[in-house]
Each structure stands twice: as structure tokens, then as C-alpha cells.
């Protein structure tokens, strides 16, 4: 018997993000640019995945206004 078999974890299903959740996300993106920049630069593989995703899914609905200027520079 492995040590982890005695643990039982029950996760609640994910909740849908409503407008207040989206507002919180945009506030974090706008206010914490230095931390986000450091995270992006420290994880080049994730940055590449994000760049590829944005390049393939870019459309007129995506708002770059919510992104910090430095993140926008890195992603484009």
C-alpha cells in the first residue's frame, strides 16, 4: 500500500467566471505588471505556448487593452 492511497481528496467542480471575476483578472493584470513580466521571462516554454495560442486565436474580440504594456510587447 502506497502512502498516498490513504488520502481522499474531493474537489468541487469549477465555477464559471462571471463579469466580477473578469474584472478582478483585468485589475490584477493592470496592477501587477512587474510580477507578470518576471513570470513570463522565467518560463520561456510557457511564454512560447502562449504566443502560439494568441497567434492562432487572434481575432477582433481579444482586448489587448487589459494587458500590461510589457506583456503586450513580449507577446507580439
From Swiss-Prot:
Disulfide bond entries: 17-21
Triggers of expression: Expressed in the late phase of the viral replicative cycle.
Source organism superkingdom: Viruses
Keyword vocabulary terms for this entry: Disulfide bond, Late protein, Redox-active center
Cell inner membrane among keywords: no
InterPro entries: Poxvirus_A2.5L
Function: Late protein which probably participates in disulfide bond formation by functioning as a thiol-disulfide transfer protein between membrane-associated OPG072 and OPG08. The complete pathway for formation of disulfide bonds in intracellular virion membrane proteins sequentially involves oxidation of OPG072, OPG128 and OPG08.
Subunit structure: Interacts with sulfhydryl oxidase OPG072; this interaction involves formation of a transient disulfide-bonded intermediate, allowing disulfide bond transfer. Interacts with OPG088; this interaction involves formation of a transient disulfide-bonded intermediate, allowing disulfide bond transfer.
Similarity comment: family membership: Belongs to the orthopoxvirus OPG128 family.
Name of this protein: Protein OPG128
Gene that encodes the chain: OPG128
Amino acid at each position: 500500500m502506497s502512502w498516498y492511497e490513504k488520502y481522499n481528496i474531493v474537489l468541487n467542480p469549477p465555477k464559471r467566471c462571471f463579469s466580477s471575476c473578469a474584472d478582478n483578472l483585468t485589475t490584477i493584470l493592470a496592477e501587477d505588471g512587474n510580477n507578470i513580466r518576471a513570470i513570463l521571462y522565467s518560463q520561456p516554454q510557457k511564454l512560447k505556448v502562449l504566443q502560439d495560442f494568441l497567434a492562432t486565436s487572434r481575432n477582433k474580440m481579444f482586448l489587448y487593452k487589459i494587458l500590461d504594456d510589457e506583456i503586450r510587447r513580449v507577446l507580439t
